[in-house]
Amino acid sequence: MAGKTILMLVGEFSEEYEIFVFEQAMHAVGHTVHVVCPDKKAGDVIKTSLHDFEGNQTYTEKLGHDYHVNKTFADVDPADYDAVYCAGGRGPEYIRIDKRVQALVRHFHETGKPIFTICHGVQILIAVDGVVQIGRAHV
């Protein structure tokens, strides 16, 4: 199978593991991943978050590592991508209301291209009318 080009949507304080591990795994099997964040340019830094279970009833949240996005958000043409992935963490809590992010997700939905998400990333899909329907989402 030829490598695909995947668009990853992130926001400030997206979960570090859900960015780094996904990106590395996709590269390992021959895919290209362009990571974008609204209002950021290629090379700009976003802060990530780390969640850990430290013996409490729920996880703790800590500052993660800096991450350099590798594509300018304003330059994204969804027609250039085979799939979209929405990382989780805190990022989706605010990028889900960005009309440009919603338009990107809507494109993938309407063209039948794969949409992947993990954890809080599903908030982005829920924010786009018609993408998540009862009995049709596989989470």
Please provide the spans of the model-predicted regions.
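Conserved small/polar residues in nucleotide/adenosyl-binding loops
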Residues: 137-139
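General beta-strand structural signal in soluble alpha/beta enzymes
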Residues: 35, 115-118
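Extended, subdomain-level signal for the structured scaffold at the beginning of enzyme domains
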Residues: 1-111, 123-135
